[in-house]
């Protein structure tokens, strides 16, 4: 089998994720991040995957990196703020919300 492009790996990762195949999605997202550590969608999806398997704390750096790479995606802000709230970091969540508002 030929090597996948980043876009193909991301698409397959999303499909695996939606199908409940967390290990396969993790493998694909990890491969993308090895090639492009700041890839915004792969970072965001790794964060979503981590939250989905109960590793909420693990999700934070992925969401933060996704936001730093592409702060224009509203879902990245929502995921990051939601995770901070789930961890009881309300002050941090409010600060990030204020930051999101200032970025439009």
What is each of the regions a protein language model found here?
Residues 4-35:
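Alpha-helical segment of the N-proximal tetratricopeptide repeat
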Residues 18-19, 52-53, 86:
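Register position in tetratricopeptide repeats
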Residues 35, 69, 102-103:
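Structural marker of alpha-solenoid helical repeat scaffolds
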């Amino acid at each position: 089998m030929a090597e996948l492009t980043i876009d193909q790996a991301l698409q397959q990762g999303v499909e695996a994720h939606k199908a409940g195949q967390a290990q396969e999605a993790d493998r694909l997202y990890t491969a993308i991040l090895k090639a492009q550590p700041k890839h915004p969608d792969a970072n965001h999806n790794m964060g979503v995957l981590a939250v989905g398997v109960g590793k909420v704390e693990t999700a934070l750096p992925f969401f933060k990196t996704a936001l730093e790479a592409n702060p224009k995606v509203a879902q990245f802000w929502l995921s990051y703020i939601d995770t901070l709230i789930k961890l009881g970091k309300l002050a941090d969540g409010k600060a990030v919300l204020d930051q999101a508002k200032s970025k439009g």
